[in-house]
Amino acid sequence: MGSQHSAAARPSSCRRKQEDDRDGLLAEREQEEAIAQFPYVEFTGRDSITCLTCQGTGYIPTEQVNELVALIPHSDQRLRPQRTKQYVLLSILLCLLASGLVVFFLFPHSVLVDDDGIKVVKVTFNKQDSLVILTIMATLKIRNSNFYTVAVTSLSSQIQYMNTVVSTYVTTNVSLIPPRSEQLVNFTGKAEMGGPFSYVYFFCTVPEILVHNIVIFMRTSVKISYIGLMTQSSLETHHYVDCGGNSTAI
């Protein structure tokens, strides 16, 4: 009999212990939830003020008003910014796009200088000195492929006849070439051929010759400046000049 009573009492005591443990766990969990929901409050007596960012439920010391910025619970959504990765990626893409556009528009492109021929030739004869004076207006075509204005800072030209320099022309601050455009630049050189080339005078004044063509060689150099860079283009061209037409005698 005694053994049967003790065996029956043992399961009931175990069951009661399990129920007590379960009730204890539930009580601890309820206490933790209550603490988590309870707002932060600093009880410092009269030396405290209401924390505005805590919706009036928390307090901070008066002397730390300028030091403490905010008291935000861990569950506040402000601590979990939305779409942060998307915003960062978008910012990076925008920066790359802006950098690419800046490089594309500011990257120096070529400025092409081409010869556009001789427009006007005025011939003057000096019979006394057997001298031929050629006043030649030549034209250059300058093409600007950049997205900004370029400046033609200087232009120099030499006219040669039979490998001898007979004229030199130099000028500065020539012209400004607008973006993505081309412009014609005219310059005038004066060549005098006499002395060892006095035979040119007789050749150009012989009436029996219908066409009085002579060949001159022109070496032209152009300096161009843009966004802190300086480039130089050179041209070497040969031209036929009729020294018998459009002439005057002095």
Swiss-Prot record:
It is a multi-pass membrane protein; Lipid-anchor. The keyword Membrane applies. Residues 16-25 have a biased composition (Basic and acidic residues). The chain crosses the membrane at residues 87-107, 197-217. InterPro entries: TMEM106, TMEM106_C, TMEM106_N. It is found in: Endoplasmic reticulum membrane; Membrane. Disulfide bonds: none annotated. Glycans are attached at N173, N186. Residues 1-25 are annotated as: Disordered. Keywords: Endoplasmic reticulum, Glycoprotein, Lipoprotein, Membrane, Myristate, Transmembrane, Transmembrane helix. Its main location: endoplasmic reticulum. GO terms for cellular component: endoplasmic reticulum membrane. A lipid is attached at G2 (N-myristoyl glycine). Interacts with TMEM106B. PANTHER family: TRANSMEMBRANE PROTEIN 106B (PTHR28556), TRANSMEMBRANE PROTEIN 106C (PTHR28556:SF5). Belongs to the TMEM106 family. This is Transmembrane protein 106C. It comes from Homo sapiens (Human).
